Every structure is written in structure tokens, then in C-alpha cells.
Amino acid sequence: MNNIIVERLSLLREVMRREKLSAFIFPSTDAHNGEYVPDHWKSREWVSGFNGSAGTVVVTQNEAALWTDSRYFIAAEEQLQGTGIVLMKLKMPGTPTIPEWLGRKLVCIDSPEVGVDGMVNSINTVEALRFELRRQGGITLRTNFDPLRDIWTDRPAIPQNPVEIHPVEYAGVDTAEKLVQIRKSLARQHADGMLVSSLDDIAWILNLRGSDVHCNPVFVSYLLIGPVTATLYINKVKLQNGVEEYLCKHGINIDDYQNVKSGVKKYEGFSLLLDPEETSYSVFKAVGNVDVVCQTSPVPYMKAVKNDAEIKGYRSAMLKDGIAMVKFLKWLKPAVEAGGQTEMSVDRKLTALRAEQPLFRDISFDTIAGYADHGAIVHYEATPETDRELEPHGLLLLDSGAQYQDGTTDITRTIALGPVSEEEKHVYTLVLKGHIQIELCKFLKGAAGTQIDVLAREAMWRDGMNYLHGTGHGVGSYLNVHEGPHQIRMEWKSTPFVEGMTVTDEPGLYLAGRFGVRIENTLVVEKYKETEFGEFLKFDSLTLCPIDTVPIDKSMLLQEEIDWLNDYHARVYRELAPHLNDEEKVWLKDATLPI
């Protein structure tokens, strides 16, 4: 594989020489600035061989480098071996920014020009990059060229999978009402309309789902919302089984996907909101004389606050997922003791058990099944080359989820496959303490995730330990497993929590070369109480699955943490047991015994 990457870099550099480009930058994003992208837009992976969900590759005539975050440090080092591409560890001391690195590498070149594909870079990304490159000795930026157009000869086509209607019984609110609320918000933002580029936003607005992106039920399109009408830019072949009639009934015009730039130009004389974080720079440059309002889209926030039907759907999906998880956990240890089970085989087993549940559609992301030292690779994905046989000792980190038609799930359990060391118990209990403190949290309405994040880390910090990923992210309703704008993380995020938001609680600790621990539930924000000091909120766990008590050092837990765990396990048994057979009930009863 790495010889292929060297050949691809050579072809790329020939194109760059012909175009007089000193460097080219490949991000992870697509034309819709999504986190997960169709294969057609996986340019960075094609160039570098690195398949993580986040990262940027920069190629000059003589060097190349990949910038990625702590989730992928270990995986990136392995995947980049032999390619000549250097790993740049984001947010680590001594790591230069991309403009700083380019400033050093291009210092001896007269009038250096750096290229990016404006279709897969947002307005904000391009403008910020242009500003920073100017500061590095006047490096200019070209945005109208895709260097892989002629050399990526087997490039996958843009997917054309059919779209399906998402019933309002699961969506809770119909498309007409959503458009009314969006237009009201646009009026407050002094805009007559907006272009929606984000695929999960479009799916949510229209109550449609697709399968164009692996594990994410979305479809490639743009949605242009005007003062009265709206137009969906999509390949018509995707509109089958009454979907075109459904759109017409809701007043949605249909045009070809490739016509979005000309469609935007028709709004001359109107003000059009373009979210600078989501809208492609090339689309922005095509608007002509349209009055552009560069502001944050109102849709992600609307989508993040779940209605009663969506929350009901989550609870139903989590029940089904909990049943599948219990069946899996009951099977796991005897299967490992019998021999022959690997990281990939347990992934297949869990997916098969989920697929038996009603309304199952897909997994919600590629399962992370990391045994022993593989558990320390935050976003590890087993391959035939790395797949490891499980042994009846040590820890298995299992991060997985499913797409059910009534909800999306995301759960992590770290499981003792047999005897564990005192160090493993200590680290496991630190992570559990952080997880429970988020679950127990009561907070003033208006608080954001940044103000809550420390609760997950405080016990770890006392031990001089930390993790570098976020503590929690929003979860879609039969949509993307990662959703915003709210998060729980150290870095400042100003979006406050409100009732109806879902968020994960997933602290972890990772000891490179040894083992990793992460424990994750999905939570929903609920009202706690109102006093003379204001309104207070709390979290309620949607996830129903036992947390392994074998690796716990009980002496490290506070009484309130013990009480929470015992209460949670009593609830897990109470809600799941009626749906299990007698053997499964016996196993679950034992797994949820008070500690």
C-alpha cells in the first residue's frame, strides 16, 4: 500500500509542477463540509493512505505532512510508515500550524502559490488560510483547482442511492412546520433565504433519509430555502417510491445537483444566508450580486433540541440496543474462553445481534473493538492485518452503535475478559468516576459543556492523568452519530444546554502500548428544578446496558457514585429483563448486582 502512496505523490507532484503550484492542501471534508464523507471525496485518504475521520495532508514538491488530533496519533504513525509523509500532532508542543510549516518550507521559492480545492473547503477555512499564508512571506492561495481530477482514474462516482421518507411519527414535526420556523429565524437574522449545504440538516428539514454516506442516513444534495419556495438540488434518479410527489406536496422544487451555483445566482436582489463554516468557498464565489449574510445556520440548533416523538424514539432504540448488548455480553466471555474470537469476529457478532432487532437499519459508525494495547488507540479499527485474537484476561474496549429508524445509538463498554491488573482496575475506576460525575451533574440553565467537562476529569487530574478528546457530543435522531452545536469538551463551546438535547458522556484514559478504557452512555437533558436562583437542568441516561463491575476498585468510589451505579443497574435490569429469555435474565441479574 505504501508503495502505491509514493507513486500517487509522484503523480500529484507532476500535476503541481505543471500548474506551478508550490504546495497543495487536502482536508478531510467534502463539498458539504461533513465529518463523514462519501468515497468520491476521500482525496486526503487517496493521497496519504490515512483513513481517520479528521486530518489534513499538505504536499510540497519535496515533502509531505499530515496534521491530525490525538485520537489518531498511533493509527497515523502506523499508516504513514514508508510513505514519506510526516505526522504533525495537533495541539502538541512544538507542532507548527500548516501556514507556519509552509512558510518555512517555501521560503526559498519566488512567489509561492498554494492550492486548495474551493469546493471542499468552507468560506471560513479559505479566508483564514489566505490571511495566515499572506503573513508567511506573502504566499498566495489558489482555490479553483482539483489536482486529482485526471490522476485518480478509478475515483468512485458521487453516490446515487435512493432516498426514503422518514415518517412523521418518528420525526415528530412535519417539513412544512420546520420551514416555517426556519424562515422565522432567517427573518431575525435579516435574511430572505438560505442555502443549506449540510447533509444531515437537509435530511432533518425534509424528513427524508438516504444511504450515500457510510453509517450516516443522508443523501448528497443542496437545499435552497427562499422566502416562499424551496429547491432541492439532487440527482433525480434518487427520488423513487413517491419521494418526488412527497416533495412536490410540500412545495419543494427539484433541480439537478450540479445546478446549485446557477440556482443561487437567481437570488440577486435578495439577501441569502450562507453559513461560513458549512458553505463551500466555490459556491460562495458563484453567488454574483446576491446580498450574502455570512452567519451561523439556525438549523443545527433546531435539530439538536429533540421533540417528544424523537425522545420516545431514542428510548425505544436504546431498549433494542440494550437487548442486543446483553445478548452479546452474555456470549462474549465464554466465547473468548473457548478460543478463536478476534476483534473483528466480536464486531460481526454484535452487528448480527443488532440486526435481529426491529427497525435496525445499519451501524452508526465503524465499531472500535480494541483488545489490550489496541484499546489505547482512541479510534482504532481492526483490519485483517491488525486483527488480534482475544484472550481470557485483560481489557476489551468496545465502542459501537446502531441506526434504528426510531433513533441512533452510541455506547462504549470496557470489558474485563478475565483477570485484570491493579493498574487496569485503578485506571478503569478513574474513568468510571468521571463518567458518573457527569451523570450526576445538576447545572444552571445556560451552562455550556465547557463548564461541565471538568467533572469528568477531576479525579484523573488528581492522579496526573488526562485524555485529549472531548467528553461528549450530540447524537442525531436516525441521523449522524456526531451532532452539534453543543458539546462537552475542554475547549470553549458557547452553546448552552437546553431540555431535549442529547449528548454522550464518554471519558477515557489511554496508556499507549498497554491498554485503554472508555465508558460511554448517551444522555438527554431534562428539567431538574426551579428555585429563586433560576432554572436548573440535569441529565438522564438513555443507554440501557450494564457497566462491567469486575475491574472496579470500590475503595476509590464515593458513596454517591456507588449509589448511582447500583440505581442505574437496577433500572437496566428492570427495563431489559422483560424482553430476555430465562438464561439471559439470570446473566443480567448477576451483571447488575449491587456492589
What positions do the PLM features span?
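Active-site neighborhoods and metal-handling regions in enzymes and metal-associated proteins
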Residues: 1-595
